[in-house]
Amino acid sequence: MTQALLRDRVRCEPRRTLLPEPPTIRRMKHEPVHPAPSDADQRAAAPVVVCYPPETIPPLDSDLIAAARAGMAKVDEVVVSPREAATFEVSAGGLFRIVSVEGPQVGDLNLFHAHDLSERFWSGKTRALHGTHLSTGDRMWSTLPHLRPLATVTDDTLDWYGYDTDGGGVHDVIGTRCDPYTQHLLTCMDYHYCCHSNLTRAVARHTGRPEREVEPLVHDVMNVFMCTGFTLDTHQYFMKASPVRPGDHIEFLAEVDLLGALSACPGGDCGDEHSSDTAACHPLLVEIYESPVMESWEPAPASAYRWPTRPV
């Protein structure tokens, strides 16, 4: 075998993950090259500061939401088939639920402003404002320059889960979505039903535009029902079997007119693999509701920030 062929073979073979060594006092992903300075402990003892404290963000009117939920009626539903994606629309002031119906199943959620697809969910800022996992009361913020809430979580039957002893939580905004490019990078295999691919096809069908044209619109997701976190030793992204069971749901208020796209992840409950046909997969149900209480709902305005009229 030539060196070139051997090199390609080594590059394309899946890498084996070695169990980490027991962590030291200061956990590290790589063996350090440089010695710690004499004041290392003092430097590491600096106080933690929350980067974006959200307390000044006006909260939703909890009484209004309670009244809306009490009077809501289902007006539509969309079934998302296993290893596929579907789109749905919700008017501002409406509510929608993502429901587990047949078995544990993770869903990858994209949200867009229905009238301007360039305004879409921004997982990074949502994570910075609300943390790594979302639940009741947390909002899903849109991209710059709009930076407004697209949706707010109004109910979550998995809110009891919290964070487990592995550091795992449910409904994360840290994972990007499974995609065929990363799958090929790691395994040299082509798989066409990753959530990225499913979402791209669904948005293409909805808009009537070519898949290659809409692909850049597909963005980092909210991983609905997915149980994830960062390992305690190396801080690597991990997943474990979702605690979701049939009948569980997460519910949202649409703060603007929304286009949603949801993929039923090929990983099923994501307790093992996520980019193959190996896992048992189940459909997800999207239920759309309206409430007369919300008929006068005013969508959240875009950011009031304005660039200066002259150079600064």
What is each of the regions a protein language model found here?
Residues 25-312:
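Acidic, Ser/Thr/Pro
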